[in-house]
Amino acid sequence: MALNLQDKKAIVAEVNEAASGALSAVVADSRGVPVAAMTVLRKQAREAGVYMKVVRNTLARRAVEGTEYECLTDTFTGPSLLAFSNEHPGAAARLFKDFAKENKDFEIKAAAFEGAVTDADVLATLPTYDEAIARLMMCMKEASAGKLVRTIAAVRDQKEEAAA
């Protein structure tokens, strides 16, 4: 479909706005993936707070100029599906990683976080806020139990020395 200049400018502005407010970005190739599966992916992306759009490579390069995702311009070859995570840095990577397990033709090209290209698997394994809090609480709980055991052992040792 031919796009006139106004449509191209609108697409660039829309993607640039999404990139400016995003926490991370993922680029993927969706060649060979059935339309029904892509529709499901788009629905899951909306639910996860992920902005997703298929953009021409030239327009994608222009859209990410001046943003922290300019490092992704080398990956814009072939069909490019852009996804920007708005709520959690690992949301798009996690979504794409799960989708790639079910659809063998779906390929994750690259991911970016804080202005640098990074491995999508690393982004996908980032804990959510609630998971991070739970891990922190577990560590604190384990540390206090360890201190209690050491304190009781020290008291026992003191009593044994006093009795001897």
Curated annotation (Swiss-Prot):
CDD domains: Ribosomal_L10. Keywords: Ribonucleoprotein, Ribosomal protein, RNA-binding, rRNA-binding. GO terms for molecular function: large ribosomal subunit rRNA binding. Coiled coil: none annotated. Gene3D superfamilies: 3.30.70.1730, 6.10.250.2350. GO terms for cellular component: ribonucleoprotein complex; ribosome. Pfam families: Ribosomal_L10 (PF00466). The keyword Ribonucleoprotein applies. InterPro entries: Ribosomal_uL10, Ribosomal_uL10-like_sf, Ribosomal_uL10_bac, Ribosomal_uL10_bac_type. The keyword Magnesium does not apply. GO terms for biological process: translation. Forms part of the ribosomal stalk, playing a central role in the interaction of the ribosome with GTP-bound translation factors. Part of the ribosomal stalk of the 50S ribosomal subunit. The N-terminus interacts with L11 and the large rRNA to form the base of the stalk. The C-terminus forms an elongated spine to which L12 dimers bind in a sequential fashion forming a multimeric L10(L12)X complex. Belongs to the universal ribosomal protein uL10 family. NCBIfam families: PRK00099.1-1. This is Large ribosomal subunit protein uL10. The gene is rplJ.
